[in-house]
Amino acid sequence: MNPSTPSLLYTSIFFYFTIIATQTLSLDPKFKACEPKSCGKGPQISYPFYLSGKQESFCGYPSFELTCDDEEKLPVLGISGEEYVIKNISYLTQSFQVVNSKASHDPCPRPLNNLTLHRTPFFVNPSHINFTILYNCSDHLLEDFRTYPLTCARNTSLLRSFGVFDRKKLGKEKQIASMSCQKLVDVPVLASNESDVMGMTYVEILKRGFVLNWTANSCFRCITSGGRCGTDQQEFVCLCPDGPKLHDTCTNGKNDKRRRVIVKVLIGASAAVVGLIAASIFWYVYHRRKTKSYRNSSALLPRNISSDPSAKSFDIEKAEELLVGVHIFSYEELEEATNNFDPSKELGDGGFGTVYYGKLKDGRSVAVKRLYDNNFKRAEQFRNEVEILTGLRHPNLVALFGCSSKQSRDLLLVYEYVANGTLADHLHGPQANPSSLPWSIRLKIAVETASALKYLHASKIIHRDVKSNNILLDQNFNVKVADFGLSRLFPMDKTHVSTAPQGTPGYVDPDYHLCYQLSNKSDVYSFAVVLMELISSLPAVDITRPRQEINLSNMAVVKIQNHELRDMVDPSLGFDTDTRVRQTVIAVAELAFQCLQSDKDLRPCMSHVQDTLTRIQNNGFGSEMDVVDVNKSGPLVAQSPDSVIVKWDSK
C-alpha cells in the first residue's frame, strides 16, 4: 500500500467530520435551549412543562412552570397556594403524580388550602378518594369522625384535629363540622377506596399523594420529526434544528420537501464518501493482516480452522491468557456427552453454531454449542463468548462451564443447561400456553432480564442481540440471558463505538442501523421490543400481518399513540377484568414506548429501565419517565429493519 494512503484517509475523515460538526454547531438556539432537563432526581422536564432557571419560558406554558426542590432534587409545581413535589410524569396518560411538599418535609404535615384547579389546565385523576382534614375541632364533635387522628398536632383536652374519608357522613354533618372546627381542608389521595389505605397513619396517607391530568397541544409529531416543542406568546410551536415552525412538525410544506431532497442528496454523497473511506480502510487492514498472518503461528487453534481467515486475527498470546481459569473439555468427552452430536439432541441453532443437549460423566446436564465449520467468524465468536462470560457472575446470565481444548477438532462451548426453553417458545412458539405465563410471571421475566442487562452495561458490555430467543427460562421461569457471540466490550471513555450493524430483524436499533454507532441504548431498544412481546404474545416480525404492523415495534408505537393499546394486549392477561394488570401493563407499555424512540438520546438507560420495572412490579404505578407525547400522530420516523426476504442471521 502506498505510504501516503493512511494520510489521505485521515485527511478525508477529518474533513468529513468537520462538516458534521459544523452542522451540529449551527443548531437553532431555541432548539438547544429546550433540551430536556432535570432537578437531579425524578423525571426529565420538557414541554408542556419547563424548569425555571434551567430552561427558557418558551419551552412550555406559563401554568406548567416548575422549580427545583433543593432538598429532594425533585421538580415542584405551585397550585392554589400550596407547593406539590412531582414524583413522576407519564405522557401516555397525560398525568403526573404529586405529593404536597409539606408531606415530604414536615413530620407533621398540615395542608391549609383546598386544591382549586379552576382556570388551570389540570384536573384530578379519577383514581382518588377525598380525605378531609378537620383542624382544632371541639371535643363534642361526633366520635365517628375521628378515624385518623392528627396525633402530631398540639391537641388539647378541648380541641382535636383529625382526618376522615367518610364523605357521605361528613356531608350530612357538614354544618356541624364547620361550626365545631376552625378549618376544613379537602385533600385528594391516590386510592380506589378506603381499604387501600387501611392501617396507614395520617402522615402515611398524605405521602401517597395523588395524580393530576393535564390538557395541552400534542407534541408527538414534532418530536418524531426531530423537533422539540415550545410556545410563542402561549401558542404552540415546533422548535426544529433549523428554526421554529408554526405547524406541528419539522417536515411540512414545499420548502421542507425541497430541504428533504437536499438532505437526501447530502446523505447520499456522504454515504459515498464514507463508503470509499471504509473500503480503503478495509483494504489497508486486510493487507496488513495478510502480511502479518505469515509471521504468526496458528498452533493454539483447533487443527481444522488453521486456514480460517478469522484465525489470522486471533491473538495467540491473548487466547492463552483467556483459557487460564476456564475448564477445558476434550473433544471426546463432549462427543460422548452429546451421543456423537446426535441430531435428536439439538436444542437450537443461531448464526454461529448448533446447540446440543449433553450429559457429562459427573451427571451434570449441559448445553454444548458447536460452531459451524463454514463460518469464517467462528474463532472470533468463540473468543468473544469466552472472554466475556469468564468475567461475569449474575444469577440471570447463563453460566459458561468451559470450552474445548486448543487441540480439539472443533470449537465447542459448554454452558449450564436451562431446561424450560426460551421466552419466544412460551410466548408464540411450540410451548405457548396462556395459563402457564400469567402477567405476574411476564413482569418478573422483564425485571430479571433488565437486571441482567443493567449488570452487563455496568460491566461495559453491550449484548447486541437482545431478543426473546436469547432469554432462557428454567422450570420456575427464572431468566438466563444467553448468546454473547455478538457482544462487545465497551471502551471505558466512549459513549459509542462505530461498527457495522449486526443483530436480528425487528430488534435492531434503528439509530445503530442508520448511523453505524453502537451504544448501550441499542440494547435498550431491543429490550423494549421484548417488553411488547410480553404484553402482546406476538413475534417481533411477522410478514403475515398488515404492512404497517409487520414490525412489532412500529405496531406498538402506533397503537399506543392512538390509545389502542388494548387491541394488542394478549387477551389471556386479564387487561379488561383486573385493575392491577391493566395499570401495570399500561405502565410497562409506556416504558417500552420511551425505549423505542428512534433518537437514542431520548431513551432511558438500562439502570433506569430496571428500576422502573421494579417499581411497577412492587406498587403497580409507573415511573419517573421522560415526557413523551403519544396523542395524535403517526409512527416513529425510524424503525428496526424487518426484511426477511433474505435470511439475516445473528452474526
Curated annotation (Swiss-Prot):
Disulfide bonds: none
Residues the record lists as Phosphothreonine modifications: 499, 504
MF-aspect GO terms: ATP binding; polysaccharide binding; protein serine kinase activity; protein serine/threonine kinase activity
Catalytic activity, as annotated: L-seryl-[protein] + ATP = O-phospho-L-seryl-[protein] + ADP + H(+); L-threonyl-[protein] + ATP = O-phospho-L-threonyl-[protein] + ADP + H(+)
Residues covered by the Protein kinase domain: 341-613
Superkingdom: Eukaryota
Enzyme category, top tier: transferase
Membrane-side (Cytoplasmic) residue stretches: 286-651
Residues found modified as Phosphoserine: 498
UniProt keyword Plastid present: no
PTM sites of type Phosphotyrosine: 415, 512
TM region positions: 265-285
Job of this protein: Probable receptor-like serine/threonine-protein kinase involved in abscisic acid (ABA) signaling. Acts as a positive regulator of abiotic stress response.
Protein name: LEAF RUST 10 DISEASE-RESISTANCE LOCUS RECEPTOR-LIKE PROTEIN KINASE-like 1.2
Lineage, top ranks: Eukaryota, Viridiplantae, Streptophyta, Embryophyta, Tracheophyta
